[in-house]
Regions:
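Alpha/beta-hydrolase-fold serine-hydrolase catalytic core, especially in secreted/extracellular enzymes
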Residues: 27-48, 262-267, 273-438
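A domain-start/cap signature at the N-terminus of enzymes
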Residues: 27-108, 409-424, 438
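Gly/Ser-rich "nucleophile elbow"/oxyanion-hole loop immediately N-terminal to the catalytic nucleophile
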Residues: 100-106, 155-190, 200-206
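Active-site machinery of serine-nucleophile hydrolases
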Residues: 108-173
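Acidic beta-to-alpha connecting loop that harbors the catalytic carboxylate
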Residues: 117, 150, 243-246, 274-275, ...
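Primarily recognizes the serine-hydrolase "nucleophile elbow" in alpha/beta-hydrolase
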Residues: 181-231
Length: 438
């Protein structure tokens, strides 16, 4: 090797080492920034940390990998934890129960329980009549249990409780390692009504919904918003009502349940012949309910879904679709509003329709998304690398017309925006495609 060749060789090695060193330093810096993001003590601090990450111009795939792994959870308190419920009309505390053998390196299912008799006037009803905090068996649970507290000023069928339960779930996500695809909602009596309400308002987090001795029909009189049967089509529900129920007469509940069974292939219903308005039947069905839970993890990215709302600000999103703007177009009427039940041989309106709503019906095949709309002027498709092939063009067809076609470029800012909202390692988004309906 000549001296010139030798110098060239060592120069090449030097440049290679500098490049590798810079790559390693960039990776270390990104890991530090993401760690700062996870350790932020408030939403504002986390937003600031997210902006720092964006300014660092990281490689998208590296940031995506770090967010999909998530934070390193510290050792936390186990047992019974009181969590404040914010809000003017809410009872002061909810209860969260953490398994006694909780290990922060394992992810745990979550079960949210909505108690009955929510029209009571006691802000401490949860402690006095529903939850025995001295019951040691509760600590042997293999799931993280969340017990929100409701009363007459904040029943389950109002926005204040929908927001409260979202914040409680966010608190648990922030402090404990959960399996985001195994977050289950259960309610008894009034809590069963609440299950129907919450699933209809925001279904994104739930894997399974189990209303026991509740009433979907009652929401026609109780709900502070419109209820849409279409929103249950993709739900995994295990419903139990009783034949001798003296509060929710099965004769009037059955037509609504029959409608759910006809539109949702993932809904199961058990009618207990011998019971009144009680849970005496539960031991006999416990194993069946648990099997149902185990068989129905949440799918963050279903290839077919439907969503309907009259309020795009509070309830416009379902998983990877979001209704942005409502309005009527003469040809914008291709999707159907499921809103009839057969009552005593006659078809009647299931739920009132006093406010205009919008509906999206979405089906996806490979990278082609077909959308039918009713009463929608604009919507958004959220694109995840776990759902779409970002190396190939994405095509969106709205009401039979092409709305978008092209390569979707992953964006760090969008990734962080939706992670800030969801804090969900199993549902990350790389891009938004906004579509105006013509």
């Amino acid at each position: 090797m000549t001296s010139r060749q030798s110098r060239a060789f060592f120069l090449t090695i030097f440049i290679f080492c500098v490049i590798v060193s810079n790559i390693s330093l960039a990776q270390i810096r990104l890991e530090q920034l993401v760690q700062k993001y996870w350790l932020a003590s408030s939403t504002i601090e986390r937003q600031k940390a997210a902006k720092e990450i964006v300014r660092a111009s990281p490689v998208f795939s590296e940031l995506y990998q770090l967010l999909s792994v998530g934070k390193r959870y510290p050792v936390q308190s186990t047992g019974i934890v009181k969590v404040p419920q914010g809000g003017k009309y809410l009872p002061p505390h909810a209860v969260v129960i953490i398994p006694a053998d909780y290990q922060p390196d394992l992810s745990y299912p979550v079960q949210v329980y909505l108690h009955g008799a929510v029209t009571n006037n006691d802000p401490f009803f949860l402690y006095r009549y529903t939850l025995d905090t001295l019951d040691a068996s509760l600590l042997q649970t293999k799931s993280i249990l969340i017990f929100p507290s409701g009363w007459s000023l904040a029943p389950w069928w109002c926005h204040a409780q929908a927001d409260n339960i979202h914040r409680l779930l966010s608190w648990v996500k922030e402090n404990y390692n959960i399996n985001e695809n195994q977050v289950r909602l259960r309610g008894v009596s009034d809590g069963g009504i609440g299950c129907y309400y919450l699933a209809n308002a925001d279904q994104t987090p739930w894997s399974v919904i189990t209303p026991f001795i509740g009433s979907l029909r009652a929401l026609n009189q109780l709900s502070d918003r419109q209820i849409y049967l279409s929103n249950f089509i993709n739900s995994s529900m295990f419903i139990v009502n009783t034949n001798q129920d003296e509060i929710f007469d099965i004769t009037w509940e059955q037509p609504y349940i029959n409608k759910l069974l006809s539109i949702s292939s993932k809904t199961s219903f058990v009618q207990v012949d011998s019971s009144r308005h009680s849970l005496l039947w539960y031991p006999a069905l416990k194993d069946s309910i648990e099997r149902f839970n185990q068989l129905h993890d949440r799918n963050p990215f279903p290839d077919a879904l439907i969503w309907q709302t009259e309020d795009v600000v509070k309830y416009g999103r379902y998983k990877y679709i979001r209704i942005d703007k409502l309005g009527s177009l003469s040809k914008n009427n291709n999707a159907n509003d499921e809103n009839q039940v057969q009552m005593l041989g006659t078809f009647v309106q299931a739920f009132s329709r006093e406010t205009p709503s919008g509906l999206l019906k979405v089906t996806k095949s490979n990278n082609v998304v077909t959308v039918e709309t009713q009463g929608v002027l604009q919507y958004t498709i959220l694109v995840s690398p776990d759902h779409f092939d970002l190396t190939s063009p994405v095509k969106i067809i709205t009401n039979g017309k092409k709305s978008f076609e092209g390569i979707v470029h992953p964006d760090v800012e969008t990734l962080l925006k939706w992670n800030l909202k969801d804090n969900d390692r199993k549902m990350l988004f790389a891009a938004e495609i906004k579509v105006k309906v013509n």
